[in-house]
């Protein structure tokens, strides 16, 4: 039987629990459980896509508690023949954050000639159980230079996370372990550029543009509806006795105060 991505993940690579947390029953310690999520999968069909990803799939949460996203392992498989050109940038996003540079948890770049790849992130921050149920994470995928017909899937991505479920938001004993990564290691560091594939545009900038495009389309639809409504309501009958309609031009003072902070590279 083949080894799955979930089976290759070791909790000790991401966190150290105190002896107290390891020995004592769950009701006597702040840490309720340490879990490895089941694998969530995304098929990257479009060159640019922003998709929801369930990083806590299969994890039982505590009511009115917290969950710490201690670590994340992402595995990618190119569904292409050997020696194809192009590559991909993969970015993990916290969609709760409005500023794009703060929403990006980490990015990774891989060429298409590398048949498969894996990388890990250590977000190491907690959110409430209520927020976790809203599935707050996304993945931004930017495939560049891969010549494939539309409708086919050049890349498959799998995600598995290590998380700590706790009743109180206290991080004592949840220390992050920094690992040394060598050339022979199967898992590589965040933002490491492999071979000669270099992404010219930072992923935070890509996320900002992607969000602006979505908001721009939404505003355009709303503006069109408003213009159609005004053209009907602004027509009034001329009281001078002459035939015809008098059209009053009413200035639209609705302004969009929404501002998006400019993103910067990190």
UniProtKB/Swiss-Prot annotation:
Compositional bias ranges of the Acidic residues kind: 249-259
Q: Name one GO molecular function term.
A: RNA binding
Q: Which biological process annotations from GO are given for this protein? A: transport of virus in host, cell to cell
Which residues lie within the region annotated Disordered?
Answer: 212-266
- Entry keywords, A to Z: Host cell junction, Host cytoplasm, Host cytoskeleton, RNA-binding, Transport, Viral movement protein
Source domain of life: Viruses
User: Could you tell me where the Low complexity compositional bias lies?
Assistant: 228-242
Which cysteines bridge via disulfide bonds? none
Localization annotation: Host cytoplasm, Host cytoskeleton; Host cell junction, Host plasmodesma
Q: What is this protein called?
A: Movement protein
Q: Which organism is it from?
A: Tobacco mild green mosaic virus
